């Protein structure tokens, strides 16, 4: 039976808050550049760390179907909700809710990339993460029976494909290109788990942990400083690929140090947020819209320049906390009644007199 690691819950919770902060109009700010350097790599690294390969005697088809239920089914559920929610928002704000809007939106949902194209619209861009993670897990599950050199060769071939796609302005459907770019991060997490790279820091002195944090933060700074502009796995924007991987891994390492320091602090809220990262990932853009309109209302009362205070790092932190707190009870409900919406495939809803271990 798997033992739940509390520091991983902290890592996922901090990671999802960084995602919200990054999407809160922080892309053109210096701290937004730092957040984008590692907030999505963190999730792929954590997933690799937690990954359990399918047993050799188990059907690979069953492994794929399990990941379809835990990632692709929620993708379409939240995707359809996003189309309807966006149409409703457009209706009340005077935007487009025509037949053409619906056709482009559903086409974008089927295409499965986290951005608009000439013929498609993606109403909820963070949803790209779900099909990308699906491909990463399916590829990793297939390669689990092969030796490391085969995995390295596949990662290298995938990165060559990404470079060619980027050079010629092409993309693969269902965020497969993003999956190829994220695959090395996934394997970095798997390697850290396999060789116990974090154990010395988890069981060692605090001074050693502080030293690792300082080195990781410094390497992250250098990576961002020398890698011009934002990196984005969604759009396969990497600028300098070596610096992208260096920044993603070092930034994640710094977060891990903080989370290992918090390992002794247990919280039902953090556990719930960790369980609900898929839901938060899928719905936070609408939370940002609600909070942003609330800020605009306050700014209108404050007068000219009233919005300046809300376009800042503290406002982004507060917004992330508000959205995660606002989704706490929906997550608790879904954990008991609708685990599919949390990506918990194969887990039965909890009835009276029953308990369920979060996983």
Label every PLM stretch briefly:
Residues 1-359:
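Alpha-helical transmembrane segments and their immediate juxtamembrane cytosolic regions
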């Amino acid at each position: 039976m798997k033992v739940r690691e509390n520091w991983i819950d902290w890592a996922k919770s901090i990671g999802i808050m960084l995602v919200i902060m990054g999407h809160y109009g922080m892309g053109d700010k210096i701290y937004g550049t730092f957040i984008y350097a590692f907030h999505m790599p963190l999730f792929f690294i954590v997933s690799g760390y937690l990954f359990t390969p399918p047993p050799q005697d188990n059907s690979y088809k069953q492994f794929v179907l399990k990941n379809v239920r835990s990632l692709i089914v929620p993708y379409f559920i939240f995707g359809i909700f996003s189309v309807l929610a966006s149409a409703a928002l457009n209706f009340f704000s005077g935007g487009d809710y025509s037949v053409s809007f619906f056709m482009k939106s559903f086409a974008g949902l089927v295409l499965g990339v986290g951005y608009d194209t000439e013929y498609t619209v993606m109403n909820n861009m963070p949803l790209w993460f779900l099909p990308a993670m699906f491909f990463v897990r399916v590829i990793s599950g297939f390669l689990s029976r092969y030796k490391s050199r085969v995995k390295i060769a596949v990662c290298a071939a995938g990165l060559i494909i990404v470079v060619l796609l980027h050079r010629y302005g092409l993309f693969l459907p269902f965020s497969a290109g993003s999956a190829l770019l994220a695959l090395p991060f996934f394997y970095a997490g798997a390697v850290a788990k396999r060789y116990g790279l974090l154990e010395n820091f988890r069981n060692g002195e605090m001074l050693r942990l502080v030293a690792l944090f300082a080195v990781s933060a410094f390497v992250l700074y250098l990576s961002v400083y020398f890698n011009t502009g934002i990196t984005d796995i969604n759009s396969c924007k990497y600028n300098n690929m070596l610096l992208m991987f260096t920044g993603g891994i070092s930034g994640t390492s710094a977060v891990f140090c903080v989370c290992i320091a918090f390992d002794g602090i247990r919280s039902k809220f953090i556990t719930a947020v960790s369980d609900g990262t898929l839901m938060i990932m899928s719905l936070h853009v609408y939370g940002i819209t609600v909070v942003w309109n609330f800020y605009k209302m306050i700014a209108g009362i404050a007068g000219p320049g009233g919005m300046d205070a809300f376009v800042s790092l503290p406002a982004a932190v507060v917004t992330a906390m508000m959205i995660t707190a606002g989704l706490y009870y929906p997550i608790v409900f879904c954990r008991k009644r609708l685990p599919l919406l949390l990506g918990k495939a194969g887990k039965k809803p909890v009835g009276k007199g029953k308990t369920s271990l979060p996983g």
